[in-house]
Each structure stands twice: as C-alpha cells, then as structure tokens.
Amino acid sequence: MLDRLLGWFSVDMGIDLGTCNTLVAVRGEGILLNEPSVVAVRKGTNRVLNNGNAVGYQAKEMLGKTPGSISAIRPLKDGVISDFEITEAMLSYFIRKATGRARIISPRVVIAVPSGITAVEKRAVLDSAERAGARRVYLVEEPMAAGIGAGLPIAEPTASMVVDIGGGTTEVAIMSLADIATCESVRVAGDDFDEAIIHHMKKTYNLTIGEQTSERIKIEIGSAA
C-alpha cells in the first residue's frame, strides 16, 4: 500500500547507461536527457568538480584539454562499471537533472544493461543506482529494450533480430515470445571505431587527432551500408 502511494508522487524513469552516452526517459514525458557518460574530477581526491555538476557535456568539453590536476573520467568500460564511486556520482547528477531538485519521492528506475554481463556486474549497477537516489531499481537486457523501443513484434511467435552497437559493446540478439532465444555480446564497438580512426590518421597522414574529432569523423562519414 505504501509503495503504491509513493508511486503516485514519484516518477518512473528509464536509463540507458552507456559507455559513451547516457539517456534518461521519464514515463509520459519521453527522453529528457542525452549526455556523454563523462565526469570531471580533481586528481587525488576523485571529487567531482563544480559542486558535483561537472558531468555530461560540461565534463566532455574537458576531454583532452584538462590541466594536470583535473581528470575527465568515463566510469564505464566495455558496457560495465569500471569506477563505482564516479558512476554513482554521475547517476545522481542525471537523476537530479531529469526529475528536478524539487521532487521529494525518489524515482523507480529501469536500467538497460548488456546481456553478457556477470551477476557481480549487475549488482554493481543496482547498488550504484540505489546509492544515487533511486527508490527501486530494475534491470532489463539491452537487446530486449531495443526491440521494444523499435516496435518489433518480440512477443509474437516469430523471430526478431536486433544488432545494438554501443560505445563499449555490440549485442546481437534473436528474440521471440517475449524472450531472448540467443544472444551474443562482444566488447568491440564504437569506442574501438574511434580508436581505429585515430591510429589511421596518425599512421597514414602523421596527423594527431583527439577523441572528439575522431567521433565526429565516424558520425559524419561512417556508414553501415
């Protein structure tokens, strides 16, 4: 009864916690936030700059440009948490930004995770979200979330295929009858494309470029055809 009452005053939130970008959607309002999964901290203390607000776009602007005392961290690697405390700080910032500081009741949160992660890695996501301010946390496998979002008939007795290329992982899944029949997750994805472009530019043209330039090249001239 109490949980139902709290639900009337809180929000239901979906989070796509990616290696490169994090998206936050709120029920009835759609996607409210799409920002880089980057946090700027002071070296030695891991204190998030700007009173905990140097996250997302603000932090990404510091990538490759930060002084020696500041580090721009991406707390997820290959689709999983590599820095628990920084992930917690990042989630806390994104939840606050998406829901507004005035809300008293913490949100219920669904988080999309790679299908191939371990039980320990899932536990890390749950703990980070709870410590960041979520009232209840549920996990859904990314291929399933992608299939639902794309409007595929995943609940019907027919096969639907999803290829989800993220920043740290690529997932290929076949779904039918609201279940994943088979799925393969490989830790080769967008970040590796960016790195390959950087190496190619250096080797072929003796030109050094940064992560943001490499990503822009990938987006503007890349093709899946």
Roles of regions detected by a PLM:
Residues M1-I165, A173-A225:
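Nucleotide/phosphate-binding catalytic cleft detector across ATP-hydrolyzing
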